[in-house]
Amino acid sequence: SLYIPFWNKTVPVSEPLYVIFAAFVIVGTVNSVNLTDGVDGLAASTTMPVCIFFAVISMLWGERFLSLGVFASGIAGGLLGFLIYNFHPAKVFMGDTGSLFLGGAVAALAFAYDMPLILVTLGIMYIIEALSDIIQVGYFKLTHGKRVFKMSPFHHHLEMGGWTGHKWKETQIVALFAGVTVLFAVLSFIGVFHRFGV
C-alpha cells in the first residue's frame, strides 16, 4: 500500500507497480540531489532541513523508528559541520560521491518511513532543479536551439540573471533554496502529523 500525505490514507498498490514506482523515486531523487550540487553549500543546506524533518517525526513515532531518527540526525549534524567549510567560498567540496549519497539517503528514509510521496513537498527544490533541466533539454531539442532558462538547472539560471537580468549571488541562491525547503518541510510535517495520532 502507498501512504498519501495530507489525506492520511493508504491506497492499495500491487507489488510490481510499487517496485517500478520505488525505482523511479529512488533514481529520480538521487539524480535530483546531484543536480542541486552546483553552488557552494547548496546541496548540503537544502538537504539538512529534509533530514531534520525525518529526525523530528522519528521522535513522534516512538522507538519503532528511533534508529532512523539517529541516522537522519547524524546526516543533518554531519552536513552542519560540512557546511562550515562548504559555504561560499568553499574550501571543501561534496562532489558526486557526497551528493549521490545524500540523494540515496533521502530516498531511503522516505521509503523506510513508508511515506515516499512526502518527497513531492519535502523535496520541492530537488524537483524544481530536475524539472528545469528536463524542460531545458526538451525545449532545446524541440525548438532546435531555443532555451527556456539561461542555463540549467535552475540555480544556474538565477546565477546568470534569470528572466529579470538580476544576477543572484551564490549565498542568495543558497538562502532561497534553504528557506523554501524549510517552509516545505513544515508543510510536509503538517501533511503527515495525523499519522502519529498526536
Model-assigned labels for residue ranges:
Residues 17-198:
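Alpha-helical transmembrane segments
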